[in-house]
A protein has these predicted regions:
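Metal-dependent de-N-acetylase/amidase catalytic core
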Residues: 2-45, 103, 109, 116, ...
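Short acidic/polar alpha-helix capping motifs at helix-coil junctions
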Residues: 22-25, 62-66, 93-97, 107, ...
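ATP-dependent adenylation/pyrophosphate-handling site
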Residues: 37-88
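Short, conserved clusters of charged catalytic residues that mark active-site
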Residues: 55, 93, 125
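Short glycine-/small-residue-rich flexible loop motifs, especially phosphate/cofactor-binding loops
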Residues: 60, 99, 203
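Short glycine-rich catalytic loops that host catalytic nucleophiles or stabilize transition states
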Residues: 75, 112-115
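Glycine-rich phosphate-binding loop and adjoining beta1-alpha1-beta2 segment
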Residues: 78-110
Length: 298
């Protein structure tokens, strides 16, 4: 056990109840937790092989149970990690993991754009590939990582979708941004999905990812806290910021002009032990950015 783990174990008896009280208040609300409206086709943009589970995993499973065709497009090749394995070994292992996750979450198809992990770019080639995917699937909902995020690939994926939708004026569906590294301020969430019946499947899917060096407990704990946003409380929920095409484009364009360095500004929310730090690091700035760029569609 390294020094970091020893320190976390030492402070946990104090940190855990304090975290529970503060985040219990932070996520206290009277929102309506909903079941998904029935849709036919869903497209999920996942920069990395686990984002589809960490963010909207319970909601996707609910779509599948309702009969929707869920198509997941992974943007990167999955070749980067804190690991002793080669890039080729990692890519093969992660695709095997996704084969298992596909069955657990009920995904109809999985495809790969194969951009280098950590180097996602919105290029003419990637835009044309995404445009073709959207035209083929005709999704009523597109799930995408947020522009405001601590990982450059998550921001770049939002930009890629925004750039693509600028050239697709006939797209009438909605875009749901889902949380990964940076939890949404509760005031920014405009769709709260009750995933109590699907949470066990989400947990099962996270347990598939042996290739991942990070912990997942913080992501899953946040689903429990977000249940407190509902009145009456639900066991677990996933929160989204939903936009129409024009609103999503405006949101991304405005943030791009601001030229913030989000990886330096925010911390990943993957560990329960560090949730307070991760959620409240530059929280006022994050909340203000959502307020200034808000014109969502519900």
């Amino acid at each position: 056990m390294n020094k970091k783990e020893l320190l976390m174990n030492a402070v946990r008896p104090v940190n855990a109840p304090v975290t529970n009280v503060i985040l219990g208040r932070h996520y206290s609300g009277d929102m309506e937790a909903v079941k998904n409206e029935k849709v036919n086709n869903v497209l999920v943009l996942a920069p990395h092989m686990d984002d589809e589970t960490i963010g909207p995993g319970g909601t996707l499973r609910q779509h599948a149970e309702q009969g929707a065709n869920i198509h997941c497009l992974f943007i990167t090749d999955g070749g980067s990690s804190v690991s002793d394995r080669s890039a080729e070994e990692l890519m093969a292992l992660r695709r095997n993991e996704i084969d298992k996750v596909q069955e657990i979450l009920g995904l109809a198809s999985v495809t790969y754009m194969n951009q280098p992990d950590g180097q996602v770019k919105s290029t003419r080639e990637s835009m044309e590939l995404l445009k073709e995917k959207i035209n083929t699937i005709q999704p009523e909902l597109i799930y995408c990582t947020p522009y405001i995020d601590a990982h450059v690939d998550h921001t770049a994926t939002a930009k890629l979708l925004s750039d693509t939708l600028k050239e697709m004026e006939n797209f009438k569906g909605n875009i749901r941004m889902y949380e990964i590294n940076c939890a949404f301020p509760p005031s920014a969430i405009n769709v709260l999905v009750d995933t109590s019946a699907q949470h066990a499947k989400k947990v099962e899917a996270t347990e598939v990812f042996d290739s991942q060096a990070i912990a997942f407990d913080g992501f899953l704990r946040l689903n429990q806290y977000k249940g407190k946003l509902a009145e009456p409380n639900v066991q677990t929920a996933e929160g989204f910021v939903q936009w129409d095409r024009r609103g999503f484009i405006n949101h991304c364009e405005t943030l791009e002009k601001m030229e913030y360095n989000f990886p330096r500004s925010f911390k990943q929310v993957n560990r329960t032990d560090t949730l307070l730090w991760a959620i409240f690091k530059n929280y006022a700035m994050k909340k203000d950015l959502y307020r200034k760029t808000s014109n969502p569609s519900t």
